[in-house]
Amino acid sequence: FYTSYNLPVSIIRPFNTFGPRQSLRAVIPTIITQALSNNKTIKLGNTYSTRNFNFISDTVNGFISTIGKKNIFGEVINIGSNYDISIKDTASEIFKLMKKKVNITEENFRKRPEKSEVEVLKASGLKAKKFLNWSPKFKGKAGFLKALEKTIKWYSIEDNKKKFKNNIYNF
């Protein structure tokens, strides 16, 4: 629409946002809540896909940084952490932070259909830096682990546990 009609629009693409209050349908809360339930084995779909997880505050700040920017019209800008990690390694890091010994079982019915699975989802932050002067505060592995700690802490609070029906998605 920008090219065809000179409409002042941009596409802002957030990558795999996670953090407190997220639905248990998403992989990180699924892993955390299954581990909090003291399950010795957790059930996941494809554990080898890699993702570029982005902590919620970074995603929000990325969107806020677009306000009033006219230099982004016609651009596609990624809001991501630029740190890639597999689902399996994400689960392992969560278990380490929670001091839990847990096994992972892959279940076929939890996997996406083969033609819809994205094996590698990677964000480039070059345009976000160039046009928005934005980069994530939770950078690299250290930033990812810090964001996971905040997320685990939130899901570990008893009052917060009551807000979610763990048995609906984590059966």
Please place each PLM-identified region on the residue numbering.
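Protein kinase-like catalytic domain
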Residues: 2, 36, 67, 98, ...
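Non-catalytic, hydrophobic alpha-helical segments
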Residues: 59-63, 79, 90, 128, ...
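Amphipathic terminal alpha-helices
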Residues: 141-171
